[in-house]
């Protein structure tokens, strides 16, 4: 299994979850380019470039679990490197983060505009504000925020170019046009209290994926594998018959 983290974080975010995945012979937690210990490539920092950089670290036939921005990368891996991905687990996932014509399951553009304005002057404060948004609404918001903040810079600080490029993906990427090309089984897991990716977006994503299915965690926010680990682990192994229809 390959676990792909979200914007501003690194692969260490999965450390508490890994023991529950002992059924997998290999458990990989790569850093996205420019995050943790991974170098940041020169030139454009877009979804395709991130995917190309990460693809060599994904063994053939892997289960790929992606969270938030990492879920977008996971879906692009499944599309462009289909032989490497046998199954997707998409956590707090959406095909588009912001609202647009024909898509009202996102959040207002202004949220990411504010992050973009403050990123240059104080990226640490920007990242901490982003963490606060991630836990907002969760029943365990305070303890979850403490844990996320304790992990944030554990592998070093992310590079500015990676933060800026990743934020542009969050603001503008729209995967809806090619979701039908993803043929691998895809399990979409969402927290009902997520304020960054509304559950309606994750439900719509599951419905748009040819082999998608959907599970909702009622008390969780944007980081359910941190805030509600027991429920999240149960959801990973839940049979399709017990899950909410997409």
What name fits each language-model region?
Residues 120-173, 177-178:
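Conserved alpha/beta-hydrolase catalytic His-Asp/Glu region
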Residues 182, 188-190, 194:
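Short beta-strand/loop motif that positions the catalytic acidic residue
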